[in-house]
């Protein structure tokens, strides 16, 4: 698929993007609230049932995955990305490494993850990802965001976008 075709499929009328990229720590909190042990098997069963739902075809255009999830094979046979594709959605992957304190500022952040991104994108493409998620956090307030924060995050976003398109992903 071309980048345009991927984007159109993800954003088809009536469809949305499912953010299923929770870390093992985040899903542990959710499981704890319903008394489910945070085991890889339980995480796989949860995700498999979610992505195997018949409503996927009608309402979901894309699914953002976490590193663990994109590598999992279902008990049904296909990998998680294949299961998502079989249900008409585009598999994607979270590729940033989180917002970290921005040097020289006590109230701002910069998103990390550009180091090694080209290699990670190739691996994620081979695993079935066709789009990516990267977030930049801007704190809004008195004299915030600073011009330096805006420029630094914009530069990181531009480098990220160029690498993603080079890898044939959205």
Model-derived regions, located:
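Helix-rich catalytic cores of soluble enzyme domains
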Residues: 115-170
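Alpha/beta catalytic barrel-like cores
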Residues: 1-127, 140, 149
